[in-house]
C-alpha cells in the first residue's frame, strides 16, 4: 500500500510539474490576449516608428492616426511611439536598420525602399501613372503585393501599407515652362536616382544631386536653375521665394511605404497583426486625403505669392520627350512589369 501511495504521489508530482511547464511554455501571444477588468490589455509590444519629417507634415498626420487606431483597437496591448525629424536615422539608415532589427518601423520614400529591393525603382519611371486613381489601383493591387512579397521574402521586412508623397513637378527661376523644350539647358537639382537623371537628360537638362538641405540656398544664389518635387514641399520649404515658375507635369509619383521589421511583426498575435495592418491602411487614407485635398489651396497660395504655374501642360508631349528613358531601363525592370503598371485597370 505504501509503495502504491508513493507511486501515486510521484505521478501527481510529475503531472503537476508538467502542468507548470506547459503554463510557462504558453506563447506570449496567448497571454497578451488577456483583457483586464477595465477593458484594457497589458502592453506586450511597443513599436518605435521613425520618419524623417517633422510634426507639421502630412506624414506625421498619418502616423498620429496610425498610433491612435493601433492603441485603441488593441486596447493598449500594442503601443506606438513616433520619432520625427530623423531621430531614428535618415531614411536610408532606417531602411538598413529595418533589415538588421535595429529599427522597428519606418515611413520610407521610394528611393529608400529601393535599397531593400532595387526593382522598386520601376515606380520612378517618368509619366508612369495617369492620376491618383491609377496610383491607388496599382499599389493596392497585384504590383503592390508583388513588392510586398519580394521584400518580405528577401529582407524579412513587411510593408504595412503604401502612403502618398504626391506627383513631382519641375520649377525654375529662369522662365515659364510651357513645354518640355523649355527644360533645355537648365541645371536641375534632383535626388540621387538614375531614372530621374535620365529623365532630365532626355529633356535636355543637366542635373545636380546636392543635399536637399542646401537646395533653398542654391536656388537663391542661382547655383542651380531649378528643382523638382511635390507641390506641398514647394510650399512647406518656401521655394516660392526663390523659384517663380512651375509646371504641374507630374513626371514622377513618389510613394511612401510604412514598413515594419519582421521579428517585431512576428511578436504580434494574428489578431493584432490584422489590427495593425488595417490601422496602417486607414491611416494611409487620412494621409493621402490630407495631401491631395490641400493641393488646390496650395496652388492658389503660390499664385498669390507671384508664382506662375502651368497647371495644364500637354502631358503627351512630355511623355514623348522622355520615351527614351523606358528604352534605357526596360531590361532592368522588365517590359512586362512596366506594361502591367502602365496599363493597370483603375
Describe these PLM feature segments.
Residues 1-9:
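Positively charged n-region of N-terminal signal peptides that target proteins for export
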Residues 16-19:
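C-terminal motif of bacterial Sec signal peptides marking the signal peptidase cleavage site
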Residues 21-133, 143, 152-153, 157-346:
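N-terminal secretory/targeting leader peptides
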Residues 138-149:
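Signature of the catalytic double-stranded beta-helix
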Amino acid at each position: 500500500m505504501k509503495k502504491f501511495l508513493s507511486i501515486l504521489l510521484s505521478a501527481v508530482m510529475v503531472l503537476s510539474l508538467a502542468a507548470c511547464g506547459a503554463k510557462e511554455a504558453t506563447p506570449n501571444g496567448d497571454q497578451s490576449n488577456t483583457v483586464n477588468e477595465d477593458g484594457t490589455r497589458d502592453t506586450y509590444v511597443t513599436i518605435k516608428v521613425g520618419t524623417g519629417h517633422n510634426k507639421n507634415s502630412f506624414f506625421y498626420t498619418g502616423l498620429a492616426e496610425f498610433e491612435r487606431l493601433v492603441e485603441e483597437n488593441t486596447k493598449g496591448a500594442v503601443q506606438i511611439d513616433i520619432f520625427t525629424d530623423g531621430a531614428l536615422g535618415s531614411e536610408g539608415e532606417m531602411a538598413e536598420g529595418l533589415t538588421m532589427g535595429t529599427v522597428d518601423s519606418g515611413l520610407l520614400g521610394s528611393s529608400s525602399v529601393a535599397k531593400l529591393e532595387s526593382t522598386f525603382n520601376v515606380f520612378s519611371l517618368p509619366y508612369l501613372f495617369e492620376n491618383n486613381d491609377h496610383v491607388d489601383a496599382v499599389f493596392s493591387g497585384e504590383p503592390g503585393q508583388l513588392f510586398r512579397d519580394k521584400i518580405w521574402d528577401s529582407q524579412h521586412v513587411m510593408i504595412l501599407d503604401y502612403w502618398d508623397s504626391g506627383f513631382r513637378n519641375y520649377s525654375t527661376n529662369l522662365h515659364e515652362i510651357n513645354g518640355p523644350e523649355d527644360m533645355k539647358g537648365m541645371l536641375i537639382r534632383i535626388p540621387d536616382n538614375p531614372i530621374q537623371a535620365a529623365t532630365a537628360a532626355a529633356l535636355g537638362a543637366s542635373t545636380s544631386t546636392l543635399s536637399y538641405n542646401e537646395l533653398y540656398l542654391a536656388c537663391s544664389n542661382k547655383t542651380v536653375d531649378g528643382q523638382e518635387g511635390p507641390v506641398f514641399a514647394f510650399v512647406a520649404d518656401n521655394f516660392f521665394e526663390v523659384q517663380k515658375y512651375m509646371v504641374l507635369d507630374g513626371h514622377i509619383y513618389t510613394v511612401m511605404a510604412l514598413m515594419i521589421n519582421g521579428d517585431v511583426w512576428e511578436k504580434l498575435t494574428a489578431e493584432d497583426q490584422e489590427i495593425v495592418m488595417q490601422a496602417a491602411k486607414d491611416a494611409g487614407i487620412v494621409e493621402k486625403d490630407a495631401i491631395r485635398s490641400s493641393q488646390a489651396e496650395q496652388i492658389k497660395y503660390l499664385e498669390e505669392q507671384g508664382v506662375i504655374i502651368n497647371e495644364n501642360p500637354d502631358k503627351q508631349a512630355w511623355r514623348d520627350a522622355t520615351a527614351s528613358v523606358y528604352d534605357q531601363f526596360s531590361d532592368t525592370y522588365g517590359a512586362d512589369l512596366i506594361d502591367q503598371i502602365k496599363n493597370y485597370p483603375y
